[in-house]
């Protein structure tokens, strides 16, 4: 069995004008594809070849396998966290975010601060941990499942996620990203 690059759940231009077609083509077809291809090369002919991405992330057989499996999973999840469909958060989700962070806008502010303030490459996440919602950032390929957390939403803060559109302005990227968050998908993760 080999791992496959999942198709985007929307057309390459579906997130415009917030995230460009060019960014999605490079990000998905080059960066994400590279992680999948490297992972296949690393696990070919080993007992790891028949495991799921989740198993490889949780078991972390080698650092190289972990990094590529986590990046493959993180990206597949990231694509689902976005849509060009203008989905708004439900009252139920807003209530949970309000209980945890003081309101939807307060959640977005705290998440943005964590994402923009992250030093270097990585990810910003909304996770469920011990029954509570938390905002965390992880470095490089680190996936929260490694620490027993359940991912609900993620934003890729590696520069390749935004450099074509906003150059080195991560804050501008986050401002655009909020316009394409797929709140329905987030709620389905709860």
Curated annotation (Swiss-Prot):
Pfam families: Sod_Fe_C, Sod_Fe_N. Gene3D superfamilies: Fe,Mn superoxide dismutase (SOD) domain (1.10.287.990), Iron/manganese superoxide dismutase, C-terminal domain (3.55.40.20). Keywords: Iron, Metal-binding, Oxidoreductase. Binds 1 Fe cation per subunit. Coiled coil: none annotated. It catalyses: 2 superoxide + 2 H(+) = H2O2 + O2. InterPro entries: Mn/Fe_SOD, Mn/Fe_SOD_BS, Mn/Fe_SOD_C, Mn/Fe_SOD_N, Mn/Fe_SOD_N_sf, SOD_C_sf. Belongs to the iron/manganese superoxide dismutase family. Homodimer. This is Superoxide dismutase [Fe]. It comes from Entamoeba histolytica (strain ATCC 30459 / HM-1:IMSS / ABRM). The gene is SODB.
């Amino acid at each position: 069995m080999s791992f496959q690059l999942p198709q985007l759940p929307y057309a390459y231009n579906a997130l415009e004008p917030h995230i460009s077609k060019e960014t999605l083509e490079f990000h998905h077809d080059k960066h994400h594809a590279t992680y999948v291809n490297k992972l296949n090369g690393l696990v070919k002919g080993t007992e790891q070849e028949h495991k799921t991405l989740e198993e490889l992330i949780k078991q972390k057989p080698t650092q190289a396998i972990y990094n590529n499996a986590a990046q493959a999973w993180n990206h597949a999840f990231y694509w689902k966290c976005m849509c060009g469909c203008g989905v708004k958060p439900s009252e139920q989700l807003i209530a949970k975010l309000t209980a945890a962070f003081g309101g939807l806008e307060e959640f977005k502010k705290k998440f943005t601060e964590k994402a923009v303030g992250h030093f270097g490459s990585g990810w910003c996440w909304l996770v469920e941990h011990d029954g509570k919602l938390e905002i965390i950032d992880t470095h490089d390929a680190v996936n929260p499942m490694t620490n027993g957390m359940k991912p609900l939403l993620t934003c890729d803060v590696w520069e390749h996620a935004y450099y074509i559109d906003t150059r080195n302005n991560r804050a501008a990227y986050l401002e655009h990203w909020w316009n394409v968050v797929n709140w329905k998908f987030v709620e389905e993760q709860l």
